[in-house]
């Protein structure tokens, strides 16, 4: 599949196989939140162990890396996953930082972390719960933010003709 100046949206790994190697400049994605949220259908993570979930994500990352051009970027939007007490192994709710496992995989595949952004959702979510009144024994922080990590595939920056750059400059009003 030849792609030039287009937006493409795939819902599954299988559809990405249609894309040629090193044909995409930018990928923006947000993986399902493991077994924490049911999106319906055959989503990755739901009903899987954490290790199975990470293996499934790694297959997706491999395919993303295959289609990324050298110096291409992949922006991954994730949030720390709240794991309920009945599944945590600690007899209490815990937070699992999925980015640790994603980062390990990306480093092995020779991508580097270019930048990080934090999406503050605190205006929409109450931040902290102090336990039960009147005995607040535990602070249970709500994950009121998401992280966006931008990974870059090793390689030279693609040369863009000057006339094309000039044609696509933003006016100050557009900026």
Enumerate the predicted regions with their spans.
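Core catalytic lobe of class I
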Residues: 1-175
